[in-house]
C-alpha cells in the first residue's frame, strides 16, 4: 500500500481510483463513499489484521459508467493508471494519476448537459470588491468580471457554476456571502496575485497586454482569470488551444437577475421535480449552442433599446 498512500497523499481531496489489474479500486474513506454513491459492494482488505482497510472497486471497462456518477455527486476524482505493462515490470508496477476530473472541469459527455453551460468559477475576494471568472472548458467560453458582492452574486446565480475555486484564507468569508451549496476547491494565497495572473494569461494567449480583453483596468477580474488557468494546470488540463480569449462582463451589459428572481420565476430550473421551467417552454432551438445561448439571454435580459431591436431583427430573419 506504500505506492497507493504516496499517490493519495498528493491528491488528498479526491477520490482516488487506483488501477489494479483489470479493476479500479478505492480504499478507506474513498471506498465508503464510492460504495454509497455507486451502489457497489464494500468489503475489507486484510480482514482481521492490523492493516485492515475498507475496499470497493469496479472493472476498468466500466469507468465511463461510474466516473460520471461520482462527479455528479460533487466529488473530485483522480484516475490512477498503470504506466507500464505489468508483465514487463520489475517489481511494483509504475502508476500515476492520468486524469483529474472535478465538478467544474470535465470533458466527459456522460456528465455534460448539452443544453447547459458547465462553468468552473474562481472568486478573488478583496475588501474593495470581488473578482470572478467563469470557464466552460467543453466550449472554450471564458468570462471575467469584477464588482460588488451583489453584482457577483447575480453572476453566480445566473451562470450556475458547478464548482468554485477559492483562496484558502477567504473561504469562510465567501461562504457567508454566497452560500455553501456548490463544491469548492481551495488554492494557496500566492496564486491570487495580479502579476502571476498576467503571466499566465500572456503565456496562454501570446499577448503583451490585456487591453484587448478589457481587463487592463480590472485587476480583480484578471486575478480570477489567472486562478482558473492555474487550476486547469493542477487538474492536468493543459490542452487549451480552443480557448480564444477572455470576455469581460460588465454590470451595464444587461439586467442580471438575482438568485431569488431566477429561482422563484423558475426561469432555468423548475421548483418541483415534475415541473417545467420557462427555458424548457421557450426552447425551440436546433443546436446545443443555441439552447445554451437562450438560457443566458433569459437570465440576462437586455436593457439597451438598440441591442434589443438588433436581437429581434436577428431572430426575425
Model regions and ranges:
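Charged catalytic and DNA/RNA-contacting regions of genome-maintenance
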Residues: 1-317
Amino acid at each position: 500500500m506504500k505506492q497507493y498512500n504516496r499517490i493519495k497523499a498528493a491528491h488528498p481531496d479526491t477520490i482516488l481510483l487506483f488501477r489494479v489489474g483489470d479493476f479500479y479500486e478505492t480504499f478507506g474513506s474513498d471506498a465508503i463513499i464510492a460504495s454509497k454513491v455507486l451502489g457497489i459492494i464494500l468489503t475489507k482488505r486484510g480482514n482481521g489484521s492490523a492493516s485492515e482497510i475498507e475496499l470497493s472497486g469496479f472493472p476498468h471497462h466500466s469507468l465511463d459508467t461510474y466516473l460520471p456518477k461520482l462527479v455528479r455527486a460533487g466529488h473530485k476524482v483522480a484516475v490512477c493508471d498503470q504506466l507500464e505493462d505489468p508483465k514487463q515490470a520489475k517489481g511494483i508496477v509504475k502508476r500515476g494519476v492520468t486524469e483529474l476530473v472535478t465538478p467544474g472541469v470535465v470533458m466527459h459527455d456522460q456528465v455534460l448537459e448539452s443544453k447547459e453551460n458547465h462553468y468552473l468559477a474562481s472568486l478573488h475576494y478583496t475588501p474593495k470588491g470581488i473578482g470572478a471568472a467563469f470557464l466552460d472548458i467543453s466550449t472554450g467560453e471564458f468570462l471575467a468580471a469584477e464588482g460588488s458582492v451583489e453584482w457577483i452574486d447575480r453572476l453566480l446565480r445566473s451562470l450556475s457554476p458547478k464548482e468554485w475555486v477559492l483562496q484558502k484564507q477567504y473561504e469562510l468569508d465567501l461562504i457567508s456571502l454566497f452560500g455553501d451549496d456548490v463544491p469548492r476547491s481551495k488554492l494557496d494565497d500566492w496564486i491570487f496575485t495580479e502579476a502571476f495572473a498576467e503571466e499566465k494569461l500572456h503565456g496562454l494567449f501570446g499577448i503583451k497586454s490585456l487591453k484587448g480583453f478589457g481587463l487592463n483596468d480590472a485587476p480583480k477580474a484578471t486575478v480570477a482569470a489567472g486562478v482558473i488557468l492555474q487550476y486547469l494546470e493542477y487538474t492536468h488540463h493543459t490542452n487549451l488551444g480552443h480557448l480564444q480569449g477572455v470576455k469581460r462582463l460588465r454590470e451595464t451589459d444587461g439586467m442580471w437577475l438575482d438568485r431569488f428572481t431566477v429561482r422563484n420565476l423558475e426561469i432555468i430550473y423548475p421548483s418541483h421535480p415534475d415541473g417545467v421551467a420557462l427555458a424548457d417552454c421557450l426552447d425551440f432551438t436546433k443546436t446545443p449552442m443555441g439552447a445554451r445561448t437562450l438560457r443566458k439571454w433569459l437570465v440576462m435580459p437586455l436593457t439597451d433599446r438598440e441591442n434589443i431591436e438588433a436581437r429581434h431583427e436577428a431572430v426575425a430573419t
